């Protein structure tokens, strides 16, 4: 009886191994700092790091405030990532995208909303002179405004003041 049970056990184990299929692991892209806004661009992690690098490298900071669950943010992200001119010009900026509201009161400008894109000069002055097209949310952009954003990016590259 004991040998029959051992044989059944071995048969059961062998059958289990034979029938077992390897479940392929889900391949998912790691979350990068770009969050889909431009995977080939270099992004900083924090607002403070962005300010430091903007000043040190004498480049403007482009801050994108968005939400992962906001349809307007998602649509703008898609347009931003697909616009070749913006992707190329963005290489001239210190780039930061955040899914939270930065605590710097200078970035509040006309309220808290998303998506919002703000430029900060290397002299650490917020470029309030580079709004989007809307009076109620001055620093928001929609996919249809992507060329306006491109023009504002060009203007942001003209620095407010250069140090001697």
From Swiss-Prot:
Its main location: secreted. Gene3D superfamilies: Glutaredoxin. It holds the Pfam family Thioredoxin_7. A motif (Homodimer stabilization) lies at residues 34-43, 49-56. Residues 1-20 form the signal peptide. Keywords: Endoplasmic reticulum, Secreted, Signal. One of its GO terms (cellular component) is extracellular region. It is found in: Secreted; Endoplasmic reticulum. It comes from the Eukaryota. GO terms for biological process: positive regulation of cell-substrate adhesion. CDD domains: AGR. One of its GO terms (molecular function) is identical protein binding. Monomer and homodimer. Belongs to the AGR family. This is Anterior gradient protein 2-B. It comes from Xenopus laevis.
